[in-house]
Regions:
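Rhodanese-like catalytic fold shared by cysteine-dependent sulfurtransferases
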Residues: 1-34, 42-77, 85-117
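Conserved beta/loop motifs at nucleotide-recognition and modification sites
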Residues: 37
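Short, surface-exposed ligand- or partner-binding patches at beta-edge/loop junctions that are enriched
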Residues: 80
Length: 117
């Protein structure tokens, strides 16, 4: 799995990479862990589904103001929302702006909770 992600991220991308919840869990446990960016609003982020440990809450509408700082960290970024619609939009914005190494959690927090708990 990590080899697959490394391979995908080793070449320029015009589209974000999609990762499954189980893949993301393994990625977070290994070296080179990504930055998790949760693009839901603060109420959703703190709500009943919670959020992935260590995730940064940057609502979708605020993402452009943070794009340069996120890219400057030099770590892969994984976008997360409730399902994956807003996170896919967020990833598309970042990729269009030239940010590399952007992924989307397929199924969002619903998939994360169903898979990870």
């Amino acid at each position: 799995m990590l080899a697959r992600l490394a391979r995908l991220f080793s070449r320029p991308s015009t589209a974000p990479v999609w990762v499954e919840a189980a893949e993301l869990r393994r990625w977070l446990a290994g070296e080179g862990a990504p930055v998790i960016v949760d693009v839901r609003g603060p109420d959703e982020f703190a709500g009943s589904l919670g959020h992935i440990a260590g995730a940064r809450n940057i609502p979708l509408g605020e993402l452009p103001a943070h794009a340069n700082a996120l890219a400057a960290e030099g770590r892969p970024l994984v976008m997360v929302c409730l399902t994956d619609k807003r996170s896919a939009q967020a990833a598309a914005v970042l990729v269009a702006d030239g940010t590399r190494h952007v992924a989307v959690l397929r199924g969002g927090m619903k998939a994360w909770r169903a898979t990870i708990g």
